[in-house]
Amino acid sequence: MTKIVRFGVSVEEDLLENFDKIIENKGYNSRSEAIRDLMRDYIIKEKWNIKSEKVAGSISLIYEHDVYGLSEKLTDIQHHYHDVIISTLHVHLDEKNCMEVILVRGKVEKIKKLYNEISSLKWVRHTNISITDII
């Protein structure tokens, strides 16, 4: 286990009051837990700006499955990025729409390229990416 270090933080009273309300609503047991989570999130966001960093995450997308050639194009793109794709989940939302969740692991630069290729396709209605640090 990593050594725990104590440090002090000075903030405005109203900022702390608002923070305390939020962490109480989220169910945190202490400010320390909430601050650790915020620090981790900040570090992950910064890693997203460094092309060579390794991350893991998911890309989710919703698209119309009956658009001619779209499913094949998505499959081709995924085969091209087989080295960063861990797994794919495909769900039929209704008669017209499908959702895919693509689990990824690898360098930021390649995952960004994959995400951009998918999100720029016509008839892909929505895309979202969520990343985390590989610990």
Swiss-Prot record:
Stored InterPro entries: Acetolactate_synth/TF_NikR_C, ACT-like_dom_sf, Arc_rbn_hlx_hlx, CopG, CopG/NikR_regulator, Ni_resp_reg_NikR, Ribbon_hlx_hlx, TF_NikR_Ni-bd_C
Segments forming a coiled coil: none
UniProt key word DNA-binding: yes
MF (Gene Ontology): DNA binding; DNA-binding transcription factor activity; nickel cation binding
Cofactor field: Ni(2+)
Signal peptide annotation: none
The record's free-text note on cofactor binding: Binds 1 nickel ion per subunit.
Positions annotated to bind Ni(2+): H79, H90, H92, C98
GO terms of biological process kind: response to nickel cation
Keywords, in A-Z order: DNA-binding, Metal-binding, Nickel, Transcription, Transcription regulation
Recorded family membership: Belongs to the transcriptional regulatory CopG/NikR family.
NCBIfam families, per database record: PRK00630.1, PRK01002.1, PRK02967.1, PRK04460.1
Function: Transcriptional regulator.
Protein name: Putative nickel-responsive regulator
Provenance organism: Dictyoglomus thermophilum (strain ATCC 35947 / DSM 3960 / H-6-12)
